[in-house]
Every structure is written in structure tokens, then in C-alpha cells.
Amino acid sequence: MSNNLQDILAAASGYQSVTSEPALNRKRPKTLDDYPVIPPASKKVSVISSDLTLHIGFDTEYVFNPETRQNDILSYQSYVVLPDNTGISNIIYPPDSQKKSRLSFKDFLCQTITPLLETGVITKWPGIINIYAHFIRADIASFANFWSDYKILLKGIRGTVSSFKNRYGIDFDEQQERRVKTEQIMFDKRTSPPRCSNVAFIDTLLITPGGMGLAECGELLGLPKLTIPAPYSITNMREYLLGDRAGFEAYALRDAEIAVRYALQVRNFCARELMIDRVPATIGAMAVSRFTKTLKENNMSPEVCLGTHIKTRELWLTEKQAFRTIKNPASVPSRELFETFPINCYHGGRNECFMMGVTPSDHWYDYDLAGAYTTGLLDILTPDYGNIRLSKNPDDYCGHVMGFALVTFRFPESVPYPSLPVRTDQYGLFFPLSGESWATAPEIELALSLGAEMTIHNGIIVPWICDTSPHNSESTSVFLPFVQQVRENRNRHIKGSLEEKFWKEIGNSLYGKLAQGLRAKTAFDTARGLNRSLPPSSVTQPFFAAHVTGFIRAVVGELMNALPSDSSVVSVTTDGFLTNCPLDKINMSGPLSSRFQSLCDIVDPGSSMLTCKHEVSQLIAMKTRGQLTYKAIQGKPVVHARAGVKPPADIPRSDYNDYMVDLYLNRLPGQTLSRSTLISTREMWLSESDLVSREQDIRLNLEFDFKRQPVRPAMNEGHLLMFSRPWDNMEEALQQRSLFDDWRQTHTLKTLADWDDWCDFLYCRTVFSDMKLKVGSKRSDDILVRLFLRALTQCQWGLMLKDKKSYSCKEVAEWLTSEGYSVTVTDVKNAVRAKIPQMKFSSVTPRMKSLMDIIARKYPTFCLPV
């Protein structure tokens, strides 16, 4: 564009042109916007070659090259399943390991399918190609065009690779409820008709119950994953290829076969059991699909139950010169108006550790609520969103009520486990004796029953359309048809079978979809290379999610507070707790527990609301989600929660507990663990890298997390043991947690000496720091020495002029130095000018007491102000 033309345009728009000729000619750096996510629509749409569908499992074998920091590709293998269920395998070797010799994805498919045509196995080019791999992110980057061909990468893969979500950090939520996206690929225009196929990518890892590995999938199919014989190993597949080519090929091809056979089994499951003709991107999406179908099958409107309505808008399509109607669900105004309340009350599970160290020997039971969240969903009837009302009356929140409120509270000191959550940005939930909480109705009811004083500042009550208990009016329970169907189908299949595992996972997954997007989480968007917030799912419902989590927290809290006084609780984790109280002595007659039991009876008549998962005779309590077995009970499963620590690869799983026990008991200040982690998808995208691992040192963090105040320190089995009490308030809790984070940088809490050192550190920073005294790395007796010198030279704190004159500055300095304190003559002389703070000592540390005894021998009248 010339300057004149630019000036004309600028003038027409009302803006002054400021772009110079050199700037116009200068080459502009490219940005992400120069690489379109979806290519411009072609005016001519190619027609796919045929109605033939091929299902292809694929896998790659590679070795990491430390020089290039990339992978050397050894082979590409495929396993094609024909319409008659016949399987045909193929393996392709690149000419060498250089990156330029890699196959493009299109070439891979051509070399896989063309031989089938040439040999007459198929008679026409497939119009639909479904590609399956287990953890597709590891293999898809092995193709030459992974980064350069945006058409295949960012559109074709987005519906599947983007489905890595929670496990791998890519956002897929907006795609999760849609059909798997396909990308039309033209393989050869010269043929007649042209070879054109719709290609879809499916990651089988995302459709496995519990994120099973390929070996577990193979076991369910009766198609075991092959093992690599010694002396070969997975870390150097090149040696395996060179030493045993036949074994290498069998191993590699089996992985591709398992992926596609497993996916087809899931496809059959979806058609037969879920009555859907497609495979959703994840099991969570299956749960959503099944839930909405059960509502309709039972004449229940999803819109009425969820408080949504369909919003339509018209979108003008330029290329078609026509309007397109877009329909999206949206909250009804009455729900949208009050959504802030349940969103603020949605906290997740209660997770606390009540002891630290090696517990006393006893019989410890690990109890879980039976199907906690799935059962808890039955507590929800159909809400009457149009009649939501405000209430500040605590009594309105008692009984079978859906309500949410902002409250201030104080529990009696005698309550061992306060029940109102206080959320912190950095440390999760705390349950102090007093504070401010966003609480659900069940939690408010429990708090009142425990004697809490409470003021409701703002709150809402959401009435039920049919205001009766769910067990008296089962048809009004929103989730009853879904939960019953899950239970019936699980019972129909053999325990441990693929079908039974799928139904169990479907039942457990629905709750997570209700809560999706309620808390700010970011994920990497492969389409733009940027992080963005995860959107809600199609059934995200803050009222339901908050009520269920609050109900479960309240039930667990009621059970723990009803335990006999001689019972102890080691920890609580979401829906269960570790205690030394046998099942027959647990009081389950409270109103909330009784309500939960009645829901259990609906799902499984005669069942108990509590199930015992583990039993041990002695535990190690480290922190939240960190409990180990110190002494097992013969024939009983052990407790083993590692607090996020991943043992080294050479440690067998059966030895994990022993490894963790040794690691905890012998941990050192500042200790790090070497950990191999896969690079993130974001890093793969930005650096155009293969999926490679990175070794990094992770700081060991097994110290107590101070969600409770530690008390009663003692030594047990050679390690410090502490019990705990609830914090009085959040200011005290956060102050001590912050100070402990500082102290543990160079210390561990393993002995009574460590405990004394921590207490001294805490004393200095809570007592002396408030007096504007410079603490630094000093301990309490170091600071008291300085205060004593000031009192001595200024005749304060019980000291008089005769005491000051009893010894020279040099004699005082030498005396204190001989007692282990570094004091110079100058320190003594300068003390006369230093200010003595106005303070009173309500307590002293052991270090201070020892120093006071030393001082008393020379200055018996010296005393601290109280």
C-alpha cells in the first residue's frame, strides 16, 4: 500500500496515518495469528472415497538421543481391523534415525493402506479412518509433519489430543461432549475417484477406567502385552531391534493391536450398554450422555432439573449466504442470579492429618463412606429455582434442605473436629474453632448440633419442587434413575470385567462433571499456544456440586465427632478416615449419618454406609494424604498414601511402602529426590519437541502441614509423635504455617530437640518481632542476652546501680562468652544507649530458662517483667 493510499484511508476513518515507508517495507515478525487454527474453508468440498471404515491402531518405537535431545524413531507399526474383524499388522522402518527421514502422517497411512488395496484385501480406498493409540501424545509427534501441518494437527487432533485434560494439561472440555472431530485428508488427487478420507484420532487412555495402562487393557481383552526379555530393556529399544528383530516386531505390533482392539470393545460397549453410536472422548462424557438419557427415559426434563434453558442465536455464514441457528444451554435467570452462593460454597473434600509421626500401636481401621459422591447425589431432589429465597435464620438450614450461606462462627473448645470449612488460596481448607465460612446447609446443621455460635450474614434456601425426602418420593430424586442403572449394570457383569469397571467409572465420573469449571483452573490450548481457563461442562451445576460435597463433609464430620472419647483419628481424606474405633462402636445414628444410610439402602438395601478398606497395627502419619503402614496385620491390606512422592523406577510396587517408611524416618533438611517427568504439552508445542523426559530434582516435602495445631510432643519408635487440636482462628493458623515453611527450609521435625528448636523459632518471631527487635537467625536466648545487657546498663528489670558497678564491661563480656554467648566489650558499652522495649513475658523458652539460671548466679535480682 502506498503512503498516499494509506493517508486516504486514514483520513476516511478519522485517524492520522503514522506509518512510515520504511516501516511498511520492513518484514514484520510472525506471530501466532499468522498460523490459522482452521484453514480457510474451501469453496470446493471433496467427497470421501467410499463408505468403507478402517480402524487402525498405531504405535511407534523410539530411543532418546541425548545429543539432539529428541527421539530417534526406530519403527512405525500399525494394526488394521477390517469390517469382518480381521486384523492385519504392518511395521515400517525409516531409512535412518535422522529427523528428516521420519514419515509424514499421510505417508504412514498410505504405506499402511495401499498394500491392502494392492493385495485385494480391500477393494476401495476407505472413506473413514479411525486412528487409535494409547497416550497419543507420545506417538503423534513422531511424524515428520506434526508441527508443520497445521491442518492435520490443530483441527484433526484437537478433538482427541486436546482431550488430554487433567492428566496432561491440555484443555479439552469444550470438545468433550461433542462427537470426535474428523479431518478430511486428500491422499491422492490423481486417482479416479480421488483418494479422500475423513480421519479421526482417539486416545484410548482417556477411555480406560482409572486411566489403565496398555498392559491392563490387554489383560481385560485376553491379549496380554508382551514383555521385553533380558538383557534388553524399554530404555534402549535399538538394542532389542538389533539383537532380536522378531521379538522386537512382535512386541511393537502387539501394542498397536491392543489399542485398536480395546477401542473397538469400548465401541461395542457404548452401542450395547449405553445405546450411543459413537465413542465419547472420555468416560466422563459417557457419564454425561448416560445421565441425560436416563432423565429423559424417566420423563424428567434435564432443563428443569439443572435449571437451564436453550438459548438460540442466528449466525450469518458468508460462504453459504445463509443464517445458521446456534443453540446453547444457559442458566435460567433465577439460577444465574444466586449462583455465586453455591460457587463460593464449593470446596471439595475434607483432607486433614490429626497426628504426626509413628502412631501408638493399636488396631487402626481405614473407613470409607460407601460410594460417597454417587450415593450423595441421591440427596438431591428437583430444585425449585423460581422460589429461591434469602434467609439469615440458622434453623432454616436444618433438615433435608439445600442452602448456602456466608457465616461467622465459634465452636466450643471441647469440639475435637470443627465442621465449618475456611478456604485459603495457598493451603486449601482449614477447620478452625472460629472464623468466617461459606457453608452448605448440612454443615450448618452439624455445626449447630455441636454447639457452635453462628451468625448468618447472607444465605439462600433452594426449596425442592416436591418437598419430601428422597426415599419417600424416589421419582423426584434427580439422580436416582442414573444411580440405579449404574448399580444394576454393575451387578449384571462379573466383578473386575471391562463392563463392570466401565459402569463403576461412569457412576463415579458424573459428580466431577457437575463441578467442572467452578474453580479457576487453566490449561494449555493447543490451538493458540496459550493457557486459558477450563470452561464448564454441559452439566456443570454449582448447586448440586456444592450440596453434595458439603453433605459428604458434614457426614464425615458427624461420624468423627460422635466417636467415643477414648478413640483417636489419624487422618481424614475426602470420604473416609483412619481411626482405632471398631465399626460396632461408631455411632451412625446422627441425623446426617442416618440420612446417608437411607440413601445407601436405596442403592443397595441392607448395606452399611461404612466400609473398611485397610487394617494395620501401627501407622506413620506424615501430613495430609500421607499415611504409611509401620506395622501390618497379617492378611490385611496396608495403608499406603505417599503424599505425592514417586518412588524410583527400580523400586517394585510391592516395596513402595518400605521405601517410603525409610525415606520418611531418615529424611534430611533440604533433601531432594531425582524425578523423571515428561515435558508438558505446552513445552512440546512451544519448542516443537518430541515427547521426552526430563530429570529434575524435587525438594522432599514430608513435614507436617499445620492444618491443625500440633500438641503433646513425645518420642515413639525413635521418631517424634505429636497429636493436634483445631486452630482457634485463621490468623494464628496462617501465621504459624507461614513461619513453619520458613523454618523447614533448613530443619526437619523428627526429635524433641527439633520440636524445641521450632518452638524457639516461633517464639522469636511472634514475641520479639512484635517488639521491633531484630531477630534474624538468632534464637530466644541470644536475644535475651541483648535485653539483659540493656537492663544491666540501664538498671532495669530488677537490676540496680550496684549490680551495674559489680563488674566491668570486660568482665561481663568474658563471663557471657565463657557461657557460650558471643559478647564483646563494645556490645556491653553500646547497650546503655539501646532502647528497652515495653513488654511482658507470659512464658519463656527452654533456652531462655537456661540463660536465666546462668544470670541468676551472678545477678539474683534479675527478673523479666510479667
Curated annotation (Swiss-Prot):
E.C. number: 2.7.7.-, 3.1.11.-, 2.7.7.7
Region (Palm2 domain): 550-678
Region (Palm1 domain): 287-385
Result of changing residue 623 to A: No primer synthesis, impaired polymerase activity
Keyword DNA damage: yes
Residue span of region TPR2 domain: 523-549
Entry annotated with the keyword Thylakoid: no
Superkingdom per UniProt: Bacteria
Cofactor: Mn(2+)
Spans annotated as Fingers domain: 482-522
Exonuclease domain: annotated segments: 50-286
Reaction(s) catalysed by this chain's protein: DNA(n) + a 2'-deoxyribonucleoside 5'-triphosphate = DNA(n+1) + diphosphate
Keyword annotations of the record: DNA damage, DNA repair, DNA replication, DNA-binding, DNA-directed DNA polymerase, Exonuclease, Hydrolase, Magnesium, Manganese, Nuclease, Nucleotidyltransferase, Transferase
Additional comment: Encoded in a mobile genetic element called pipolin.
This protein's name: Primer-independent DNA polymerase PolB
Organism, as annotated: Escherichia coli
